[in-house]
Amino acid sequence: MKITWLGHSAFRIETSKAKILLDPFLSYNASFSGQDIKDVSAGITHILLTHGHGDHVGDTVALAKETGAVVLANADLAAWLGSKGVDKIEMGNTGGTIALGSFSATFTNALHSSAQITEDGVSHALGNANGLMLHFDDEASILAMGDTDIFSDMALINELHQPDIGFVPVGDRFTMGGAVAALACRRYFNFKTAIPCHYGTFPIIDQTAEKFVAGMDGSKTDVKAIRPSESLSI
């Protein structure tokens, strides 16, 4: 498995059978600068969305039309995407699991909101925010937490799914900060690898993952604070 962080909460996940973009906020992502959308979207089979905010939906509509990738989203967000011309959609909701060929995706809880704001400034709710639990054939499992704060039922997610890898938001203000994220990982999960994300993109959120890295010091989890465009082979 090859995992590439594209900045913010966007990732490319490659296995022998699937090529996935997660929360592909690329065009207006300052951390994506210097990378090429055509390169990172080449050959993608699936686009997975944790929730409806613009910094996660990002380029989904254009990429889905260009590549023919299947888009997975919560039911309300899926309906909105359908109204924009996206026609290959797998919809679900919290607690549901969807089989996607060589892997499955389960919608887990997250403490956050999910909406799009129209030109008149009105916020339109698009279902609940979620994490996504990904189980692959013969590969490590991944929990993409999405945007969230810490919550005690993270323990149930770990009990049910035993994720090997965590994509962990650490930027504060809109999600939990690094110290709280470290507490969540140490108290509720047994990740073999944790990759911090959702930081360094906007001036008003934390610019580094240092608080998370410090909070994880001494844990059994291998923390990989990789740079945007950097890849890991796991």
Swiss-Prot record:
Keywords: Hydrolase. Signal peptide: none annotated. GO terms for molecular function: hydrolase activity. CDD domains: metallo-hydrolase-like_MBL-fold. SMART domains: Lactamase_B. Gene3D superfamilies: Ribonuclease Z/Hydroxyacylglutathione hydrolase-like (3.60.15.10). It holds the Pfam family Lactamase_B_2. InterPro entries: Metallo-B-lactamas, RibonucZ/Hydroxyglut_hydro, UPF0173, UPF0173_UPF0282_UlaG_hydrolase. Belongs to the UPF0173 family. NCBIfam families: PRK00685.1 (NF001911). This is UPF0173 metal-dependent hydrolase RL2074.
